[in-house]
Amino acid sequence: QRKLYDWLFALRSKQKVMDQIRLLQPLVHISGRFSAARHYVGVVLPLAWHPRNRNALIVCDLHLDPQVLLEEDAATLRQRLYTRHENLAQGELPVPLKLIHINRCPVVAPLSVLRGEDQQRLNLDMPLYQARALRLSDAQQVWQAKVQAIYAAEEFVPSDDPEQQLYDGFIGDRDRRLCEQ
């Protein structure tokens, strides 16, 4: 238990988290975004760093079929990424992308932490995950631009209403001087 605590405690450092990450090398990720049925455990494949947020890593959840990344265009993927799974049309695959924020103490570890009995207990199909990772690695030219386009698009539109602008972020220098008068 002490080694586990020390490992998790060390992950509060962004540098320690970054030391665990190698693009296109699968790793174990524990997250509340994974369901209790999955024991909150996921095997993910780091695809790329976020184009606008240097603290965010774009990963593919290998539990889900990544074929959708290879077949659909960026606009469709972006729309589907923010659609709840139960609201997807029958036959539509969910987009298996997720962000890991390295400045929020994420729990990540190399695949070597999973023993054979752990893989069985957690119902992890490692050969399937390895095959999916290999397929994505071989098809980088197909999904790379799409993934960047999905996350490069403006996600935040500032409001024109002055009262709502209070929630848009920091007040501009001109407005701050007016407030101080």
Name each model feature, range by range.
Residues 1-181:
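DEDD superfamily 3′-5′ metal-dependent exonuclease/proofreading module
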